[in-house]
Amino acid sequence: LGLAAGACSGNGILFDITDPRAPERIDAVSDSGFAYWHSATFNNDGTKVLFTDEWGGGTRPRCRTYDPLTWGADAIYDIVNGKLAFRSHFKMPAPQGETENCVAHNGSIIPVPGRDIFVQAWYQGGLSIIDFTDSANPVEIAYFDRGPIDDTDLVTGGYWSTYWYQGRIYGTEIIRGIDVFALTPSEHLSANEIAA
């Protein structure tokens, strides 16, 4: 692959690391809707990068009906001739309440051959499993949401990150511990894809 990507607070960058002792910055992108470029993840074959925006630092409700859909979201870029080409934003579709801190944070790729699937932590927004195989049209194919920690007061909590490991998804919940999930076949994901 010979590439590295970074989310650098104010922008996203792409490096050529063919020579690890002399990395070369080959592209940088910015997005007026992104407040804090937080993480960068390649798809399975290194042809796309998914960046997250931790708008508000993860401590405020940012997934309400009136919050912009491009803020606190994911930005998906294809890598075309060594350059980052913007394709789309994705933000969880289920609105959250005033007592739920919610914004894109950390996540990981679910390795399904021929597809680009990402499990995204949204703090108290729970987790989304996003199919971004079509970079311009990402879609949520599964989700889990525990609901607010407190119905009357904002308490910072929720999923810090979600990890795929040996057929399971691990959600590290700041207040309530760890949740472990198994994917089940659906119209969006076959048993063979899950087993791959």
What is the predicted function of each stretch?
Residues 1-196:
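Feature marking well-ordered beta-strand scaffolds used for ligand recognition
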